[in-house]
Amino acid sequence: MSNIIKQIEQEQLKQDVPSFRPGDSVEVKVWVVEGAKKRLQAFEGVVIAIRNRGLHSAFTVRKISNGEGVERVFQTHSPVIDSITVKRRGAVRQAKLYYLRERTGKSARIKERLG
């Protein structure tokens, strides 16, 4: 029975997901339905956490909008996500960057990873 579930989950996985790590700046384009219209909405920020669970994988993106911190959790293989673009690679030494929630301004900056 579990082999059937694994096979179905494998078919649902997206193949075009770029490799990114915590600290990277990404732009996620998401399909949004407003009434009868369907349009793309971009959400650009820093990846602060990644949860690897196969089909149930997710990542958290944080940005500052009008001086207020906004975090959004995206399911990596969701059909709602149109594209994920890595804008900048960040050099961090931790897997979860929750400490950025308390930081503002220059102390919330992340060095760029070279190479």
From Swiss-Prot:
One of its GO terms (molecular function) is structural constituent of ribosome. Pfam families: Ribosomal_L19. Keywords: Ribonucleoprotein, Ribosomal protein. SUPFAM superfamilies: Translation proteins SH3-like domain. Gene3D superfamilies: 2.30.30.790. InterPro entries: Ribosomal_bL19, Ribosomal_bL19_CS, Ribosomal_bL19_sf, Translation_prot_SH3-like_sf. GO terms for biological process: translation. One of its GO terms (cellular component) is cytosolic large ribosomal subunit. PANTHER family: LARGE RIBOSOMAL SUBUNIT PROTEIN BL19M, RIBOSOMAL PROTEIN L19. Belongs to the bacterial ribosomal protein bL19 family. This protein is located at the 30S-50S ribosomal subunit interface and may play a role in the structure and function of the aminoacyl-tRNA binding site. This is Large ribosomal subunit protein bL19. It comes from Erwinia tasmaniensis (strain DSM 17950 / CFBP 7177 / CIP 109463 / NCPPB 4357 / Et1/99). The gene is rplS.
